[in-house]
Amino acid sequence: MAVFLLATSTIMFPTKIEAADCNGACSPFEVPPCRSRDCRCVPIGLFVGFCIHPTGLSSVAKMIDEHPNLCQSDDECMKKGSGNFCARYPNNYIDYGWCFDSDSEALKGFLAMPRATTK
């Protein structure tokens, strides 16, 4: 009887698993990125990026290493010569930030952005 109920429940209530569509442009400030928790937004500019599926993260790690402004630490910014402060994106889905000079007006605007988007 239990086997019959189990078999009929899968027939009556089929589950459809769809893969996330991780294509197109995105904003590093968008939560969840790319309209799906299964995707990640990789910035190519301060406010714009492209969507990827996490299986492509090894190529993303290489891109972060090669991108002059993407960073994971202040030391990385100094090593790349693109600033001395790594400002993290206010998005839990993004594990890196953007390099700034710590006394720049651009940094002040970037740090004010999360407050502006949550109001």
Curated annotation (Swiss-Prot):
<keyword id="KW-0800">Toxin</keyword>
<dbReference type="GO" id="GO:0090729">
    <property type="term" value="F:toxin activity"/>
</dbReference>
<feature type="propeptide">
    <location>
        <begin position="117"/>
        <end position="119"/>
    </location>
</feature>
<keyword id="KW-0758">Storage protein</keyword>
<dbReference type="InterPro" id="IPR032000">
    <property type="entry name" value="Albumin_I_a"/>
</dbReference>
<protein>
    <recommendedName>
        <fullName>Albumin-1</fullName>
    </recommendedName>
</protein>
<dbReference type="GO" id="GO:0045735">
    <property type="term" value="F:nutrient reservoir activity"/>
</dbReference>
<feature type="propeptide">
    <location>
        <begin position="57"/>
        <end position="64"/>
    </location>
</feature>
<feature type="disulfide bond">
    <location>
        <begin position="26"/>
        <end position="41"/>
    </location>
</feature>
<feature type="signal peptide">
    <location>
        <begin position="1"/>
        <end position="19"/>
    </location>
</feature>
<dbReference type="Pfam" id="PF16720">
    <property type="entry name" value="Albumin_I_a"/>
</dbReference>
<keyword id="KW-0960">Knottin</keyword>
<dbReference type="Pfam" id="PF08027">
    <property type="entry name" value="Albumin_I"/>
</dbReference>
<comment type="function">
    <text>A1b binds to basic 7S globulin (BG) and stimulates its phosphorylation activity. Involved in the signal transduction system to regulate the growth and differentiation as a hormone peptide.</text>
</comment>
<keyword id="KW-0732">Signal</keyword>
<keyword id="KW-0708">Seed storage protein</keyword>
<keyword id="KW-1015">Disulfide bond</keyword>
<dbReference type="InterPro" id="IPR012512">
    <property type="entry name" value="Albumin_I"/>
</dbReference>
<feature type="disulfide bond">
    <location>
        <begin position="22"/>
        <end position="39"/>
    </location>
</feature>
<feature type="disulfide bond">
    <location>
        <begin position="34"/>
        <end position="51"/>
    </location>
</feature>
